[in-house]
Amino acid sequence: MKMVDELKGNLNSFLILLGIFSFLQFSFKQSFMFPSILPLNIPDSNLLLVIGNISFYFFFVFLLIVSMILSLTYKSLIPLTIILTISPFITLIPNYENSFLLYSLEIAILILGLASTIEGLIKSSLLSILLIPTLVLVNLGIYASILLNIFHNALFISYLTIYLISIAGYLAYVISWGKIKSLRNYIAISVGLLSMIPFIFFENIISHNRYLEILMNMILPSTLGITLYNPYHITLLVMALGLSTMGIVTSLIKGNVSSGVGYFLIITTVFLGIDGFSLLIYMLTPIIGFLVITSSEIESKRRLIDIISPTRNG
């Protein structure tokens, strides 16, 4: 029991480490492979790839630790944590990507993922209602992957629109979290707005440079996994990334590490489902990311589950 309490008490420390290695594996492994094949001179590219690969293993370890800690609160996460634990060994099975075992696990992740995200929502405060679009985004990404991997059909929807709606809800959640009328909140929002400036400049450069626009249309969607049905929406994607950065930075400065790290986990992996998740760890990450966000509200005095079922405790 003492060990459990210590793990829960150190959750923020594990989240910080998870966020660091998630950023490194995203920058130098997950997304680095796409610009690295272009005829560009990238200094020390081999070293960066090594950093990315090493970071990926640490990312897996800390994701597993965080998932184990959260499963103490969210019971529907327990089977998903077990799947995450065995996921590296599944790749050792010959032709595993077309095996009945993998298909069964993916369907299980879809069902349990929906249950887990709903559990995370109802066990958090009323403020978390603003995260419903993000919940939809997470589960749509998993559904799109299964639809393609198992049934060989693509889900044709405007992912960018859903992403923008998710950002709107997330920003409203971040700004409303904690004391709104406080110096820390004003500083956090100000720094968050400043973090958008590079994206605004980048959007302006792209919109006035057709060659760069074509290049970014290949790199950015490939990096995130998102599909843009209108190539001229690349500037909207850049602004969406800027708004996401603003929300994450604001959240971190306000002291809500869970919200910042959780949303980063979601946006860097959820769109990989559009073309089918290549690894189960990427399929599970958005679910865990959503629960990471809602975990900051678990101690709230007015939780949704208490309103839905007033006689229920816990």
Curated annotation (Swiss-Prot):
InterPro entries: Cyt_b558/566_suB. This is Cytochrome b558/566 subunit B. It is a multi-pass membrane protein. The chain crosses the membrane at residues 47-67, 76-96, 102-122, 127-147, 155-175, 186-206, 233-253, 264-284. Keywords: Cell membrane, Electron transport, Membrane, Transmembrane, Transmembrane helix, Transport. Its main location: membrane. It is found in: Cell membrane. GO terms for cellular component: plasma membrane.
